[in-house]
């Protein structure tokens, strides 16, 4: 076996042969790797006759397709075949059946498990194979194949085990397809997604728009088919995006956000082109009247640094943060104007291969919202996609007799028992009241509040005496001893007996799984008290539904996992642990409507698509682009994490439902009768931001300049679940979904932090309607708008931007002072490489003009320092250093050439690189081609090149953001040895390039008569 170690031991990978190891090292551009050869002696002999060098354990859950046949004889035949097969290939494990679910664990080598699981997945006797755990193991737990007596009835007669196993497995199986891929992957690794730290990464991001979907939603004749359109769109996106190595970040109303790693940029474009072709084929196959004939996609692609992070409270989501996400959205919007189906930025072009670059066509420089500088974009030679043409087709389509596969029905037309639980009907009398201090201070930590219990619609009419069953899962706050468990049983027994409640409590590996039976009022009251018990945490309701009779005769049947029942079959304990522990995280990421429907004992796949009127809320951070583009990714995450917790809490406290977390934006909806509560939630959100600024007023913290705008609109939306079993989305979509985002944008123009549209004032309480709002001069789509009255609800965008720029300047100045203090301290020299903490701040006597540049006497330039300067700068910015660049800088310290062509992973690496190469005074040739050099930063690159007294060649080719030569002329003036600039692939005019060459020729002639030592850096 061969082991490849790189990144100073932080990354390790094993290979079976040396050739495979070398190919991986070359393909991954690993220059600092070391290869070790080792011999591994197998330590496990059970389970196979062949020697095994590494073991893996895989656990999965599936549902039987024929549960009525799963009797003892059926399972015995299955056991006989499985035992012979697995003994032959060297696999051990166990199989447990608890109707209608199979639970299986298999152990073996990678090759054996991959082969076996591929066959298992294709077996028609079960469906929905969900991997619960898959990772390396140090030894086998099961020396032989445990199939004998593996039916749950032969293992235990205890009703608690059978009931709990069924309920958890059912919920887990249903929720899995709704999980974000990142959360699912972390659960497979045994990690809690809620506890994961943010991960910076270089990604190719795309926004895929369903063209003119808002027009389809607004067309009264096509509302019934909207669920079909969304389902087809989701399936097509998942198939082409995940099929090319990407991950779907999220679906919004007719929009898919996805991202690829940097080395899959070409695959990204191929997948997006294939998506367009698949939709074209789908359109051609439709019958007359089908709205599926109107599906077109439009994509914008951008490349940059982003932060994958987990944010939220009660309702969380994995989201991508960063300036590149906003830019990708703007590029997609720009494609509407340019009438192209696929538009990509210059940064994406930089990471493509030469063959794909040749087929690209430039679309010029364009100004986009939120960016000071124009964006260079490119396109393929494809057929024009005009939104006006699609809109005309939508208006002309006549459904006729065509009937949708998943028809959308009005919410009010359904019987109460048939309505999906889309609104929070929690009885407010069960919710704890806030103290006066808590009501006054919205910054107070309210994490200790009880999460509201969502009641299924089927239970609302049963009365307090209705018999119900409730099962919950929680984690022990500390290890439980036998004395602790005995105390819990003694107290709970007496309490349950007095309330006419029966049930069971199972303790397994630090987890509690309890079932309560009894009158609804008593069970709910007890459950709310149990949630506040400090001996456990992460309490999640798994099942709550009416019951026809009691299953348990005792007030509390306490069962410990250490008792004979689990000891007789050890796999059962492991299975319960792998099911219950991840389930605690599931509820946070799955849509609330799905959780409610599932908790009531229903199958979420049967949710009826409905159209319903709602109050829609959207809020985002004002001037987030200028705030985020000068903050580190970690700071951006800190901002969003802080506001998401407060925003979501305010929405839930007023009875709203969170739809999505989108970058810095949160969307939510309230019932049509909840206009007042929606306004109160808006006020709490705005108040929180104001108090946040006050809390950090005297501290240089990025949260001190946060302000937000909130928009409220009223209209009809469609709620439906879309997608295959592989990935399912619960979508809230409507014309109002797009309009409410325009209402949020209107808050800036109107100067009001809260803006509501015309339908809402009539739904407000008289006092708030008559004295709390004023008309706005502007409107949205001809609809009048109103803003909240009062100085505390004013929104001054100019002041907000001034505060943001002032914050950046103050922090840069503070960092510069810190460097100066370190430089001038007695007995101390200059900081490493003389790195300024903020590249935008110059020491006294220096300006942005290269022509007036003079060397800093305290700046010690040393070629061996280049690598450490680069690493230090990356660390200061909170970024992960590019090890390939670090190795190149280390090698260049002893050479006169530095080739960084196409080495940078994004513009964020330019500043550390430019600070580092300043130390390479020995260079004669510098290659910075394809490295995001534009007019805005070429001046600083030139400044870094001035100390290179012998520099002769500077390669800036394939940087189309370059249009001016003035900075290069200044370099010629200071460095008389420069004889060539390579500018192919830039946008510098040929005439300017010829003038530049003439300047170099003249400069060299003049320099031949100069005295030696005339260079700026010769002392």
Curated annotation (Swiss-Prot):
List, as start-end ranges, the regions of compositional bias called Low complexity: 825-839
Q: What else is known?
A: The FB strain is deficient in phototaxis. It is not known if this is due to defective adenylate cyclase activity or defective BLUF domains in this protein. In wild-type E.gracilis, photoactivated adenylate cyclase is found in the paraxonemal bodies (PABs). PABs are not visible in all cells in this strain, and are smaller than in wild-type.
Q: What is this protein called?
A: Photoactivated adenylate cyclase subunit alpha-like protein FB
Residue intervals of the BLUF domain: 55-148, 467-559
Task: Indicate the family of this protein.
Answer: Belongs to the adenylyl cyclase class-4/guanylyl cyclase family.
What's one GO-annotated cellular component?
motile cilium
Q: Which gene encodes it?
A: pacA
Q: Where is this region: Disordered?
A: 825-862
Q: Which part of the chain is the Guanylate cyclase domain? A: 204-332, 615-744
- Signal peptide per UniProt: none
Q: Has the keyword Repeat been applied to this entry?
A: yes
Q: Which compartments is it annotated to reside in?
A: Cell projection, Cilium, Flagellum
What does the entry give for GO biological process?
cyclic nucleotide biosynthetic process
Predominant cellular place of this UniProt entry's protein = other
**Cited Gene3D superfamilies:** 3.30.70.100, Nucleotide cyclase, Ribonuclease Inhibitor
User: Which top-rank group of organisms is this from?
Assistant: Eukaryota
Write out the entry's keywords from A to Z. Cell projection, Cilium, Flagellum, Repeat
Q: Name one GO molecular function term.
A: blue light photoreceptor activity
Compositional bias annotation for Polar residues: 846-855
The record ties this protein, via InterPro entries, to: A/G_cyclase, Acylphosphatase-like_dom_sf, Adenylyl/Guanylyl_Cyclase_3/4, BLUF_domain, LRR_dom_sf, Nucleotide_cyclase
What is known about its subunit structure? Heterotetramer of two alpha and two beta subunits.
Species of the source:
Euglena gracilis
């Amino acid at each position: 076996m061969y082991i490849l170690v790189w990144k100073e031991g932080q990354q390790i990978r094993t290979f079976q042969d040396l050739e495979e190891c070398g190919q991986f090292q070359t393909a991954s551009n690993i220059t600092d790797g070391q290869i070790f050869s080792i011999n591994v002696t197998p330590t496990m002999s059970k389970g196979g006759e062949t020697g095994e060098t590494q073991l893996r354990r895989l656990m999965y859950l599936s549902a039987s397709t024929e549960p009525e046949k799963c009797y003892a004889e059926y399972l015995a035949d299955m056991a006989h075949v499985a035992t012979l097969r697995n003994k032959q290939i060297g696999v051990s494990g166990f199989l447990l059946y608890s109707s209608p679910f199979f639970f299986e664990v298999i152990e073996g080598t990678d090759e054996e498990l991959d082969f076996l699981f591929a066959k298992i997945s294709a077996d028609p006797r079960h469906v929905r194979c969900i991997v619960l755990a898959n990772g390396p193991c140090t030894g086998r737990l099961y020396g032989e194949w445990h199939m004998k007596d593996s039916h749950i009835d032969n293992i235990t007669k205890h009703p608690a085990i059978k009931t709990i196993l069924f309920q958890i497995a059912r919920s887990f199986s249903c929720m899995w397809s709704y999980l974000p891929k990142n959360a699912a992957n972390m659960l497979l690794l045994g990690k809690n997604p809620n506890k994961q730290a943010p991960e910076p990464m270089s990604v190719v991001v795309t926004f895929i728009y369903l063209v003119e979907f808002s027009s389809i939603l607004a067309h009264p004749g096509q509302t019934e088919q909207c669920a079909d359109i969304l389902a087809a769109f989701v399936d097509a996106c998942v198939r082409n995006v995940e099929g090319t190595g990407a991950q779907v970040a999220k679906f919004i109303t007719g929009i898919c956000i996805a991202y690829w790693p940097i080395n899959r940029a070409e695959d990204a474009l191929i997948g997006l082109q294939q998506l367009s072709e698949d939709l074209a084929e789908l359109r051609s196959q439709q019958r007359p009247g089908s709205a599926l004939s109107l599906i077109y996609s439009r994509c914008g692609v951008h490349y940059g640094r982003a932060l994958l992070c987990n944010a939220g409270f009660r309702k969380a989501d994995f989201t991508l943060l960063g300036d590149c996400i906003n830019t990708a959205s703007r590029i997609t919007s720009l494609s509407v104007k340019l009438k192209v189906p696929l538009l990509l930025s210059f940064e994406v072009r930089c990471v493509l291969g030469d063959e794909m670059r040749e087929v690209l066509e430039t679309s010029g420089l364009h100004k986009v919202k939120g960016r000071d500088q124009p964006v260079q974009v490119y396109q393929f030679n494809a057929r024009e996609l005009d939104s006006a043409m699609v809109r005309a087709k939508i208006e002309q389509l006549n459904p006729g007799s065509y009937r949708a596969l998943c028809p959308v029905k009005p919410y009010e037309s359904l019987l109460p028992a048939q309505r999906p639980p889309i609104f929070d009907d929690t009885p407010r009398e069960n919710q704890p009241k806030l103290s006066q201090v808590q009501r006054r201070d919205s910054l107070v930590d309210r994490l200790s509040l009880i999460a509201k219990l969502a009641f299924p619609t089927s239970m609302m009419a049963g009365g307090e005496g209705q018999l119900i069953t409730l099962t919950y899962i929680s984690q022990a706050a500390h290890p439980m001893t036998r004395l602790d468990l005995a105390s819990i049983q003694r107290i709970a027994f007496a309490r349950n007996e007095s309330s006419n409640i029966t049930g069971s409590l199972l303790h397994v590996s630090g987890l509690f799984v309890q079932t309560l039976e009894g009158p609804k009022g008593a069970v709910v009251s007890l459950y709310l008290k149990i949630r506040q018990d400090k001996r456990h945490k992460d309490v999640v309701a798994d099942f709550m539904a009416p019951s026809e009779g009691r299953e348990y005769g005792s007030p509390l049947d306490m069962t410990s996992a250490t008792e004979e029942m689990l000891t007789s079959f050890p796999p059962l304990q492991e299975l319960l642990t792998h099911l219950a522990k991840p389930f605690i995280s599931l509820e946070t990421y799955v849509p609330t409507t799905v959780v409610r429907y599932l908790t009531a004992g229903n199958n979420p796949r049967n949710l009826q698509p409905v159209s319903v009127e709602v109050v829609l809320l959207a809020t985002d951070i004002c001037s987030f682009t200028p705030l985020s583009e000068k903050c580190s990714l970690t700071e951006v995450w800190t901002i969003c994490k802080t506001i998401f917790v407060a925003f979501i809490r305010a929405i839930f406290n007023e009875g709203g439902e969170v739809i999505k977390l989108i970058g810095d934006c949160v969307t939510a909806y309230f019932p049509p009768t909840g206009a007042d509560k929606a306004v109160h939630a808006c006020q709490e959100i705005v108040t929180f931001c104001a108090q946040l600024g006050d809390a950090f007023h005297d501290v240089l913290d990025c949260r001190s300049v946060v302000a937000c705008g909130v928009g409220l609109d009223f209209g009809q939306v469609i709620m439906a679940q879309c997608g295959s079993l592989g990935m399912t989305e619960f979508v809230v979509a409507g014309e109002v979904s797009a309009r409410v985002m325009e209402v949020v944008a209107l808050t800036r123009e109107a100067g009001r932090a809260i803006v509501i549209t015309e339908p809402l004032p009539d739904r407000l309480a008289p006092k708030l309607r008559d004295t709390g709002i004023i008309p706005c001069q502007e409107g949205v789509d001809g609809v009048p708008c109103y803003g909240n009255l009062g100085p505390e609800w004013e929104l001054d965008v100019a002041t907000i931007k001034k505060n943001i720029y002032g914050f950046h300047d103050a922090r840069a100045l503070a960092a510069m002072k810190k460097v100066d203090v370190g430089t001038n301290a007695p007995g101390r020299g200059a900081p490493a490489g003389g790195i300024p903490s903020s590249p935008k701040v110059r020491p006294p006597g220096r300006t942005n003009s290269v022509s007036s540049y003079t060397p800093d006497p305290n700046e010690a330039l040393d070629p061996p320092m280049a690598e450490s300067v680069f690493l230090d700068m990356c660390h200061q910015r909170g970024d992960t250093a590019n090890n390939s660049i670090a190795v190149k800088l280390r090698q260049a310290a002893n050479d006169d050439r530095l080739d960084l062509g196409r080495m940078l992973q994004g513009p964020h690496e330019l500043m550390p690189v430019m600070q580092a190469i300043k130390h390479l005074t020995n260079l004669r040739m510098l290659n910075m081609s394809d490295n995001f050099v534009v007019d805005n930063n070429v001046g600083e690159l030139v400044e870094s090149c001035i100390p290179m007294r012998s520099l002769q060649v500077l390669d800036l080719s394939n940087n189309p953001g370059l249009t001016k030569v003035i900075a290069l002329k200044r370099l010629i003036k200071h460095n008389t040895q420069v004889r060539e600039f390579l500018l192919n692939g830039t946008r510098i005019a040929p005439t300017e390039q010829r003038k530049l060459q003439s300047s170099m020729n003249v400069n060299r002639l003049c320099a031949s008569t100069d005295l030696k030592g005339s260079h700026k850096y010769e002392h």
